Amino acid sequence: MEEKKRLHLIIADAELETVPPEILDHPAIVNYAKRRKKRPEKIILDSTYHHAALRQLEDGERRGRPDIVHICLLNALDSILNKEDRLRVYVHTRNDYVIYIKPETRLPRNYNRFIGLMENLFEKGAVPEDLELLRMEKKTLNELIEEINPDVVFIMHEEGELMIPKNFGKLLDKFKKPTVIVGGFPHGDFKSKVDGVKISLYREPLMAWTIVNEVIVSYEWEVIKKFKS
């Protein structure tokens, strides 16, 4: 049976991590962990609550942004493309962990519940453990791409070739297994080095979730219409 044509979307170098060892004893971390009745090393780093501690970290100004992953995943998983089983979404983190997400996964809309879910995932490796709707493995971005085995890789980058979303959708549609990489960080460049075609959808920088939306919708128009006509 011929494999379905799907878009593979990777949220890469995502600023999603548990609190690193070098700031475990920082008052901002200790107090937050105490309020939540958790051990400091088990909590997700979050700039909203831990900004004072982040000043002590390398790249601290861009770290602790699980909200970016949350919004990107909510938008992607609730898309028409995903409902039509034409999308696969992955999260690759700054520390080279990959989160595999089953298409039927329904993430919590509430941010605090999402954080709790991520903390369970980092601790257990899969949630829920019996269904593994979310599963985590130690893996680099390049290893994930090799596993997907795409026929093309596009990297969404502000210095890439400028292309309107509609035309990018048409370009994606030319391939059987296109893979698109979107940065899961607030600013700066990718930490991981990956070969691919750099594309920009607008003359100014866009937030990751906006890019995710534009990419998915541009591809939806090209793919879905063929199966609805």
Curated annotation (Swiss-Prot):
Keyword S-adenosyl-L-methionine: yes
Gene Ontology annotations of biological process type: rRNA base methylation
Entries under SUPFAM superfamilies matching the protein: alpha/beta knot (SSF75217)
UniProt feature coiled coil, ranges: none
Transferase listed as a keyword: yes
Keyword vocabulary terms for this entry: Methyltransferase, Ribosome biogenesis, RNA-binding, rRNA processing, rRNA-binding, S-adenosyl-L-methionine, Transferase
Site (Interaction with substrate rRNA) residue list: 65, 106, 109, 113
Chain positions of site Stabilizes Arg-65: 67
EC number: 2.1.1.-
Enzyme class at the top of the EC tree: transferase
Gene3D superfamilies given in the database record: 3.40.1280.10
Annotated S-adenosyl-L-methionine binding sites: 183, 188, 201-206
Catalytic activity field: a pseudouridine in rRNA + S-adenosyl-L-methionine = an N(1)-methylpseudouridine in rRNA + S-adenosyl-L-homocysteine + H(+)
Gene Ontology MF annotations: rRNA (pseudouridine) methyltransferase activity; rRNA binding
HAMAP family linked to this entry: NEP1
Record note on quaternary structure: Homodimer.
Function: Methyltransferase involved in ribosomal biogenesis. Specifically catalyzes the N1-methylation of the pseudouridine corresponding to position 914 in M.jannaschii 16S rRNA.
Family as reported in the entry's similarity comment: Belongs to the class IV-like SAM-binding methyltransferase superfamily. RNA methyltransferase NEP1 family.
Protein name: Ribosomal RNA small subunit methyltransferase Nep1
Species name: Pyrococcus horikoshii (strain ATCC 700860 / DSM 12428 / JCM 9974 / NBRC 100139 / OT-3)
